[in-house]
Regions:
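Conserved SAM/SAH-binding loop
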Residues: 61-62
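Proteins that catalyze or organize thiol-disulfide redox chemistry
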Residues: 1-51, 65-66, 72, 76-78, ...
Length: 173
């Protein structure tokens, strides 16, 4: 399912509570709005491609006028990103797909970002063996991330493999 239709009654459960598990992208729209009919399918396609990394929630402002008022919707389409129960970013208008993709990168953590958070937790707990495979996978996914290389070098130093640490750090541009 590429999106969920949200009502005034379901907003708390479908958006606010869900946003503690995954980012929720809320599309405020109306059936009569031409730009909304252009933007909607783009957001739905991106949500489908995201495979659960974030949730697309659609609010018909004609049916949920109080939500539109509560969130100060001045014009539609209006898209807001909710994380941990709060709006973290938004845009208005029917942006082209590449601009929406760039916007999503700002508000939805990548799998590499999530891996780094998990690895930092392992490192903080002294669980270097648990952090290593997480960081190695993150490095394969995004070899340009310098922070991943630094953490891998830290693990090598911890393991007494100074030459390995130096080799990892030497590859940083």
């Amino acid at each position: 399912m590429p999106h969920i239709d949200v009502t005034q009654q379901s907003f708390e459960a479908d958006v606010i509570r869900q946003s503690y598990e995954h980012p929720v992208i809320v599309d405020f729209w109306a059936p009569w709005c031409g730009p909304c009919r252009t933007l909607g399918p783009v957001l739905e396609a991106l949500a489908d491609e995201a495979k659960g990394e974030w949730i697309l929630a659609k609010v018909n402002t004609e049916e949920a006028q109080q939500l539109a008022t509560d969130f100060q919707i001045q014009g539609i389409p209006n898209v807001k990103a909710f994380v941990n129960g709060k709006v973290v970013d938004e845009f208005a208008g029917a942006l082209p797909r590449p601009m929406i993709e760039d916007w999503l990168k700002k508000v939805v953590p990548s799998s590499t970002d999530k891996a780094i958070v998990a690895a930092r937790g392992h490192l903080r707990d002294g669980a270097f063996d648990a952090a290593r495979p997480v960081l190695e996978e993150a490095h394969v996914e995004d070899p340009s991330r310098i922070d991943v290389r630094i953490y891998l070098a830290e693990i090598a130093v911890h393991d007494g493999k100074l030459d390995d640490a130096r080799a990892i750090l030497d590859k940083i541009p």
